[in-house]
Amino acid sequence: MVIAAPASFLANWLIPRLELFEQAHPNIQLRLQTNARPEALLSGTVDLLIQSSSQLLPDSILSLPLLVERTGPVCAPDWHPQPRSAEALAALPRLHTASHSAAWQEWAQAQGISFANMAQGRALDHLSLMLEAAASGLGIAIAPDLLVERELGRGRLIAPLGFIATGYHFALGILATRQEEPELEILCGWLTQQAHEAEPQK
């Protein structure tokens, strides 16, 4: 079974959980790749797609909600000054990623605030580089909670203002004609269970 998803999702959310799947389903071999485009699913080179619900899919692909997308500022625990309010971020060095250049603007709008210079700060190509820069004390980053859960757990990063829902979610994409295939059902069911366990407890 071939799963395609963004590299940041694979590295930070799925790969840390793969051993659990292999223990539960040793007869299902998984391959991971980053060609997370609907065309790969339609051509048959990919069995399961994981992507943001903000991306449109053709009618032939069934979309199944997986994880609510929440985002928030993260920084090193000893980084100073730590922001105590959303407004305080306006004067602090912010980190950006090319893969989601509008992340800060979307977060600020959700908070009901605006920054005079939204593009202020360092721009990095990949989320992993941005998070490493944040952990190294180079500024404050903006990232989904599910992609920083390991770094938060290890104490390399903190989320001083918490996370807020973006209105989107990560979703599973499968061909509608294949939804009853046993291995796909097992895989989708396992991913859904893992997602449920990862959701913050209310």
Task: Give each language-model segment a name.
Residues W13, L57-P58, S101-W107, L124, ...:
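Tryptophan-centric aromatic hotspots in well-structured domains and transmembrane helices
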Residues A7-S8, P77-D78, S99-A102, S128, ...:
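Alpha-helix/helix-capping structural signal
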Residues M1-L57:
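Central regulatory/effector-binding core of bacterial HTH transcription factors
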Residues A5, A116-A159, A165:
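Hydrophobic hinge/microswitch elements
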Residues V2-A4, L49, V74, L95, ...:
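Short, well-ordered beta-strand segments
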Residues Q33-L95, S99-A102, A108-A123:
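Acidic, Gly/Pro-rich loop/turn segments at junctions of secondary structure
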Residues G162-Q201:
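A late-sequence structural motif
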